[in-house]
Curated annotation (Swiss-Prot):
Name the record gives this protein: Large ribosomal subunit protein bL33
Alphabetized Gene3D superfamilies for the sequence: Ribosomal protein L33
GO molecular function: structural constituent of ribosome
InterPro entries: Ribosomal_bL33, Ribosomal_bL33_CS, Ribosomal_bL33_sf, Ribosomal_zn-bd
GO biological process: translation
Keyword field contains rRNA processing: no
Keywords per UniProt: Ribonucleoprotein, Ribosomal protein
Organism of provenance: Burkholderia cenocepacia (strain ATCC BAA-245 / DSM 16553 / LMG 16656 / NCTC 13227 / J2315 / CF5610)
GO cellular component terms attached to this protein's record: cytosolic large ribosomal subunit
HAMAP family: Ribosomal_bL33 (MF_00294)
UniProt-listed SUPFAM superfamilies: Zn-binding ribosomal proteins
Length: 55
């Protein structure tokens, strides 16, 4: 079977709280690292989340 085009990634908060989201991304359309603003419930604000590897 062919390997899927989507990889599982972890989006980790840049606020230093340790909070993270998991999602998938298409590695062909977006080969660079993803950075997106999302809500961090620990600091109760919208902060930037950056892509890290799932261990």
């Amino acid at each position: 079977m062919a390997k899927g085009a989507r990889d599982k990634i972890k989006l980790e908060s840049t606020a230093g709280t340790g909070h993270f989201y998991t999602t998938t991304k298409n590695k062909r359309n977006m080969p660079e690292k993803m950075a997106i603003k999302k809500f961090d419930p620990v600091v109760r604000k919208r902060v930037e989340y950056k892509e890290t590897k799932i261990k």
